[in-house]
From Swiss-Prot:
Residues 1-22 form the signal peptide. Residues 796-1357 are cytoplasmic. This is Vascular endothelial growth factor receptor 2. It is a single-pass type I membrane protein. Belongs to the protein kinase superfamily. Tyr protein kinase family. CSF-1/PDGF receptor subfamily. Glycans are attached at residues 35, 44, 66, 97, 161, 209, 247, 272, 303, 307, 407, 501, 560, 621, 631, 640, 681, 688, 713. The chain crosses the membrane at residues 775-795. Residues 1298-1312 have a biased composition (Polar residues). The active site is at D1039. It comes from the Eukaryota. The lineage of its organism: Eukaryota, Metazoa, Chordata, Craniata, Vertebrata. It holds the Pfam family Ig_3. First expressed in embryos between 5- and 7-somites in the bilateral stripes that contain the developing angioblasts, and then localized to the intermediate cell mass (ICM) and the developing vasculature. By 30 hpf, expressed in the major trunk, head and intersomitic vessels, persisting through 4 dpf when expression is seen in developing subintestinal veins and in the remaining vasculature. It comes from Danio rerio.
């Protein structure tokens, strides 16, 4: 019976297959056609729909009538005739729910649209029922993750604006045409993830202000797949009493529930994943990943016994799918460790093997701690090391070499019992013998006759010892006359002889030695006298095999053959073949053509002539020369050489005395003439103004073609900005200008002809045009002033600080790390090479400016780094040799930070960088010629005057009229100032007056010879301005001090910190605290105690910087020991007294910066406004105004390189000495115990304790150091302190009134108010500055002798 059923089943399968093939091969008729040609038609509700279908076979219809009871209204009638099948569908009184697809198809064939069926989509329009209702109240839409979903809310009216809504939660999903797509025939099509969270969705439309909703659709996300099931650990070992923890984890689809079942070895039964007994506990956990679920069940068995040993099985079931995972457990009675009994084992390997394994047979629980030793030296594994631990114990050595041989010892220690076991393995590395000289020696050794050379063979075979023996062969026994070049030729020379001292013509001595340390065998063969040619062979042998080296020993006298004019002459040249020999050894030189040897390249150097077939040459022009001296020369000229002259030539010489003939061979090869040809044609280029472009014209030809470039039929010559390289093959145009546009032609010519290629260069963008007509006048002025400039330069250098004090650098700041870590900040910052990259070949390094632990800063000259100049002095920061990758990344991060900060006048700005491979990383910043502010102030101590000195000159009528001209602005200033940001040079010019350079030099010569109070306030104001900019860029400096402020030309100060250029271990300003060195004198209390760096801690440092400025570079806290007591007193409220040259307003500003609470300190914006008012007042007393730059002005002028700001160095015209008038100028003294809020405070100053052993170092007084001589004199001169500038001035100009108004309404005031502010103005109160005011004024004399103490009445909160 079973056999019959099987046969019937097989027969049925065969019939089905044949029928299917018959259907495939059967003729398919033409598709049916409808009387309606449109794909979509529209009718109104209650209308009658009639569709006629014609075809070649029996027809049937499919309709959406199942949504309604349309049996009585839907009829299908046969209309066949004329040989075609015909069927008519009639639907009367159509309703909206019958909207859909009406398809006509062949009854006996599968439905294929356009082949066996045809359809039309009918909209039955009913504006009262715009949505096609489903039969039930709701429908379920099943979705799967990652698939498209169709929400089938069909409409009866095609052109409706339909919106999809989710109900839980309520949300509108608008149609965007990309993810959410509306199709009036299908509904909404969208990804499943868009509605996977929604419980219910529905469609909605509005018709004539009436809203209609479709039936609701329930969204059901289904899933059942279990991707994987893991049980960890798979192999567990424990001792009695320990705890077993097994974690069964399944990764599934979303919305999948898992039932976990556990099977134990000793119970042989399954328990569910939620059971809990005294020893067995399970816990479940669920974790949703981004596209799956992670379901886990953890089994915990307390106090395992020996009976718990066995297999544990975890079964996970989702209903439709099930997976099983298992793990094994071995329970031991107690910890142990056991190694194999063999104490010494030998492991052999071969050099060059991929790996060598030293396997350790052991059995232990728990896993022991393993240490490996090689020759009693501990092996430390590293990632890049070739040794690895396999499974934590076995040692694997990759890429075996001879150096790996040795004794390896493994030491295993039980982590619980501390029991220790060790075994030693000897690794022997065998290798085939290798003769080292074969790697570097030539095929032949040529020695002078009578010399005593030594032949050496050095061989090694790894751990296998090597023996070396020598053999020799006379040249008569080698049938190959030419010197051997390959092993195939050497195979013919097999008559080797053993060595003996009395055989052959070359007496010799043999010696062999072994180097025990390197396992190398060295054998030498000493030739006592080189007499005749011979072959020598050394053979190295060990148990792995052998190696040999053949030395072709050639004895020669002076012979040489050369070809002129070059070793590779060209067809058509006049060639000379020259043979040179020692005339004391050779004579009768003759040239021959060799006939029996062809195409031997290269030929041997010298062979016996009797082995060659020589043909005589007609030599009428052969000349013998050089008979004087020891050499004789035979020249054979070949005029106008042709290809027929190619071949092997021999110069025959005869040896004096023996008449033996030796031939020197040379294979003459000529290079055929070839017409010039351009290999790659030029292509048109479009470049931007100031970019560089390169045209490459690769040519070939013999002789080498000459290349000429032309532009618009004019020859291109190399010059400024135009570079020709590689014999004119490469044309480079630097800093392209508009006039560089044109047609460039490369023409290559030689004797055979010429060829050219052309390309058109188009230049886009506008360029900065320089008035060429001004070049000649400016050049004449510069030349005429050269001597005067040289004098000024010498004077400046005399008063410049030492080179050791020049610490020029860049900004070493940090980003505010509240948002993310510093490393992540730097990773996110980008470097735009197209904007900042500067070629290294246009950078000329000069003298070093600073040097630190791992970096250095050098002065350099950059060519073309700025548009307006061709040569700029810059500072370049670079790493020292041997810098690590982390130091490279640190410098690269600081480069990115500088780019992120941007440009500002009072910050050392970035100019470019060199980051490309092929050279060191270099960061290019501005160069500040006057060095750091601290050193500069110290150098100017003897040249300080609180007031401005003026050189009187007679004003002319035109100048007076210009000064009074009201058209020159509200400020009444007839000068305009331009400040070049990059070069730091400023110029004040009047229309029709002096030129840029003249005014600049006059200005510097008159104003830079001494310091004034206005200078000090200006420095402070500019630093505050720069810090305000840094604060706006969320940057914290952390080391704001005078040493990190650089002074450029025209009194422009720039904030910097050459971190790598300063070695903090050698700087006395940095005090060791733990493992770090910190500038404690400049640090705020919260930074010292809590390591908190904020912008307000920079404000504290700014206050200390003010103290440095107004003490002319003195070290803060003079005479105070910087230790824990200093930090404690600082926290208790003790502050420094006013410096010698500070006004009350300035000192009060310092105290405000030193307030205990960071939030009570002024911001840099407030400090800018306050110091700007003080600077304005000081400038007005000097007869002019100083207008601080605003942020808007700064940003605008950073685009254009000239800043429209009134320079603090302006000219004063008068017929008498400069007179300064003061209104209500109070005497300089301490503030009247007022803080920034006007609240009286009691502050303690640091008490100076003079000690016996004092040392003064550059004005710096540290622990155990007393006051300097200047400071002692200052105490006696305090009473003679000069009057101060008052910030509340009564000025007669309206700009002065504006300044006063600004001063009164400032958002931040110093807290000082003069008691004489309302006193009457004394017109006769004035001070005339004398010419001899260059000497330092007397320091103020204080009555309190530094004993006055001020303390806070209550500590700040």
């Amino acid at each position: 019976m079973a056999k019959t059923s099987y046969a019937l089943l097989l027969l049925d399968i065969l019939l089905t297959f044949n029928v299917a093939k018959a259907i495939e091969l059967r003729f398919v008729p033409d598709p049916p056609t409808l009387n309606i040609t449109e794909k979509t038609i529209k009718i109104n509700a209650s209308d009658t729909l009639q569709i006629t279908c014609r075809g070649r076979q029996i027809l049937e219809w499919s309709t959406p009538h199942n949504r309604t009871s349309s049996e009585t209204r839907l009829t299908i009638s046969d209309c066949s005739g004329d040989g075609l099948f015909c069927s008519t569908l009639t639907l009367s009184k159509a309703v909206a729910n019958e909207t859909g697809e009406y398809r006509c198809f062949y009854k006996s064939l599968p439905k294929e649209d356009g082949k066996t069926s045809v359809a039309v989509y009918v909209f039955i329009q009913d504006y009262r029922t715009p949505f096609v209702r489903i039969a039930q109240d709701y429908d379920v839409v099943f979705i799967r993750e990652g698939e498209q979903v169709v929400i089938p809310c069909l409409v009866s009216v095609e052109d409706l604006n339909v919106t999809l809504y989710t109900k839980y939660p309520v949300k509108e999903l608008s149609t965007d045409g990309k993810e959410v797509i509306w199709d009036s025939r299908r509904g909404f099509i969208l990804p499943s993830r868009v509605v996977s969270y929604a419980g219910v969705v529905y469609c909605q439309t509005t018709i004539r202000n009436e809203t209609f909703q479709s039936s609701p659709y329930i969204v059901a996300v289904v899933g059942y797949k279990i991707y994987d099931l893991t049980l960890s650990p798979q192999h567990e070992r424990l001792t009695v009493g320990e705890r077993l923890i097994l974690n069964c984890t399944a990764h599934t689809e979303l919305n999948v529930g898992i039932d976990f079942q556990w099977t134990f070895p000793h119970e042989k039964r399954s328990v569910n994943g939620s059971m809990s007994t005294s020893r067995y506990k399970t816990s479940s956990n669920k974790k949703k990943l981004w596209n799956s679920l992670e379901l886990s069940n953890t089994l915990t068995v307390e106090n395992v016994t020996l009976n718990d040993t066995g297999e544990y099985i975890c079964t996970a079931s989702s209903g439709q799918m099930q997976k099983i995972a298992q793990a094994s457990l071995i329970v031991y009675e107690k910890p142990f460790i056991a190694l194999s009994d063999q104490l010494w084992q030998t492991v052999e390997a071969k050099a060059g093997d991929a790996e060598a394994k030293i396997l350790v047979k052991y059995y232990a629980y728990p896993e022991p701690a393993v240490r490996w030793y090689k020759n009693d030296q501990l092996i430390v594994l590293r990632d890049e090391y070739r040794m690895k631990f396999y499974r934590g114990v076995h040692l694997t050595i990759y890429g075996v070499t001879e150096k790996d041989a040795g004794n390896y010892t493994v030491v295993m220690t039980n982590k619980i019992t501390k029991e220790e076991q060790r075994r030693t393995f000897q690794l022997v590395v065998n290798d085939l013998p290798r003769i080292f000289e074969k790697d570097v020696s030539l095929d032949r050794d040529v020695h002078m006759y009578g010399s005593s050379p030594t032949l050496t063979c050095t061989a090694s075979g790894g751990s296998s010892p090597v023996t070396i023996k020598w053999q020799w062969m006379p040249r008569e026994d080698c049938p190959v006359r030419f010197l051997p070049k390959s092993d195939t030729r050497m195979a013919k020379c097999d008559k080797w002889r053993e060595m003996s001292n009395n055989t052959g013509k070359n007496p010799l001595i043999s010696q062999t030695s072994v180097d025990e340390r390197t396992l190398k065998t060295i054998s030498t063969l000493k030739i006592q006298k080189a007499v005749d040619h011979a072959l020598y062979r050394c053979i190295a042998t060990n148990k792995m095999g052998q190696d040999q080296r053949v030395i072709v020993f050639q004895v020669t006298r002076f012979l040489n053959l050369s070809v002129l004019p070059s070793s590779s002459p060209i067809e058509g040249q006049d060639v000379i073949m020259r043979c040179v020999a020692d005339r004391l050894l050779y004579y009768n030189l003759r040239w021959y053509r060799v006939a029996n040897v062809a195409n031997h390249d290269p030929p041997p150097a010298a062979v016996p002539c009797d082995t060659l077939t020589l043909s005589h040459l007609h030599q009428p022009n052969v000349t013998v020369s050089g008979l004087q001296g020891t050499n004789v020369t035979l020249d054979m000229p070949i005029p106008n050489a042709t290809m027929m002259d190619q071949g092997l030539y021999a110069c025959q010489v005869e040896i004096v005395g023996t008449n033996e003939k030796t031939c020197l061979l040379h294979n003459l090869r000529l290079r055929a003439l070839e017409m010039s040809r351009i290999v790659t044609n030029l292509t048109d280029q479009r470049v931007n103004v100031s970019d560089s472009t390169t045209l490459v014209c690769e040519v070939s030809g013999t002789p080498t073609p000459t290349i000429v470039w032309t532009k618009d039929n004019q020859t291109v010559m190399e010059g400024s900005g135009v570079i020709l390289k590689r014999s004119n093959r490469v044309l480079t145009i630097q800093r392209v200008k508009k006039e560089d546009s044109g047609l460039y032609i490369c023409t290559a010519c030689n004797q055979q002809g010429c060829e050219s290629s052309e390309a058109r260069i188009s230049v886009d963008g506008a360029e900065e045009k320089m008035n060429v007509e001004l070049i000649m006048p400016i050049g004449a002025v510069v030349i005429a002033m050269f001597l005067w400039l040289l004098i000024v330069f010498v004077i400046r250098n005399r008063k410049r600080p030492n080179d050791g004090d020049l610490k020029t650098g860049y900004l070493s700041i940090i980003l505010d790390s509240d948002d993310m870590p510093m490393d992540e900040h730097c990773e996110r910052l980008t470097y735009d090479a197209s904007k900042w990259e500067f070629p290294r070949d246009r950078l000329k390094l000069g003298e070093p400016l600073g040097r630190g632990a791992f970096g250095q800063v050098v002065e350099a000259t950059a060519y073309g780094i700025e548009k307006a100049t061709t040569c700029t002095t810059v500072a370049v920061k670079m790493l020292k040799e041997g810098a690590t990758s982390s130091e490279y990344r640190a410098l690269m991060s600081e480069l990115k930070i500088l780019i992120h900060i941007g440009h500002h006048l009072n910050v050392v700005n970035l100019l470019g960088a060199c980051t490309k491979q092929g050279g060191p990383l270099m960061v290019i910043v501005e160069y500040c010629k006057h060095g750091n502010l601290s050193s500069y102030l110290k150098s100017k101590r003897g040249e300080y005057s609180p007031y401005k000195k003026r050189t009187p000159r007679m004003p002319n009528r035109r100048e007076v009229q210009q000064d009074e001209d009201p058209r020159e602005g509200d400020l009444g200033l007839g000068t305009s100032t331009r400040l070049d940001i990059c070069t730091g040079t400023a110029v004040c010019t009047r229309t029709g007056e002096q030129t840029y350079k003249t005014l600049q030099d006059e200005q510097e010569s008159s104003d830079w010879d001494h310091l004034t109070m206005e200078d000090l306030i200006s420095y402070s104001f500019q630093v505050a301005k720069g810090m305000e900019f840094l604060a706006s860029r969320k940057c914290i400096h952390r080391d704001l001090a005078a040493r990190n402020i650089l002074l450029s030309e025209n009194s422009v100060v720039k904030i910097c910190d050459f971190g790598l250029a300063r070695d903090v271990y050698k700087d006395p300003d940095y005090v060791r605290k733990g493992d770090a060195r910190l500038p404690l004198k400049w640090m705020a209390p919260e930074t010292i105690f809590d390591r908190v760096y904020t912008t307000q801690s920079d404000v504290w440092s700014f206050g200390v910087l003010l103290w440095e400025i107004f003490s002319l570079g003195a070290s803060p806290y003079p005479g105070v020991c910087i230790d824990e007591s200093f930090c404690r007193r600082l926290k208790e409220g003790t502050r420094m007294r006013a410096p010698d040259y500070a006004t009350p307003e300035i000192y009060q500003t310092m105290l405000d910066c030193w307030l205990d609470r960071p939030l009570d300190r002024p911001t840099f914006t407030q400090l800018v406004e306050h110091l700007g008012n003080l600077l304005q007042a000081s400038a007005q007393q000097d007869g002019k105004d100083y207008i601080p730059l605003t942020n808007g002005e700064m940003e605008e002028e950073l685009v254009a390189p000239h800043l429209n700001v009134t320079s603090k160095r302006s000219f004063y015209a008068g017929n008498t000495e400069a007179q300064l008038h003061y209104d209500n100028a109070p005497p300089l003294g301490f503030p009247q115990q007022m803080n920034s809020s006007g609240v009286p405070v009691n502050m303690t100053g640091f008490v100076d304790i003079p000690l016996e052993h004092t040392t003064v170092m550059d004005g710096h007084v540290d622990c155990g150091v007393g006051l300097s001589r200047e400071q002692m004199k200052a105490l006696d001169r305090q009473a003679q302190r000069p009057l101060n500038f008052s910030p509340l001035l009564r000025c007669k100009s309206k700009e002065s009134l504006a300044s006063e108004s600004s001063n009164q309404t400032s958002g931040y005031q110093s807290g000082y108010h003069s008691d004489d502010a309302e006193a009457p103005i004394y017109a006769n109160e004035e001070m005339i500055l004398k010419r001899d005011i260059r000497k330092k004024p007397p320091l103020p004399k204080r009555n309190d002798k530094f004993s006055a103490e001020v303390r806070y009445s209550a500590p700040p909160v």
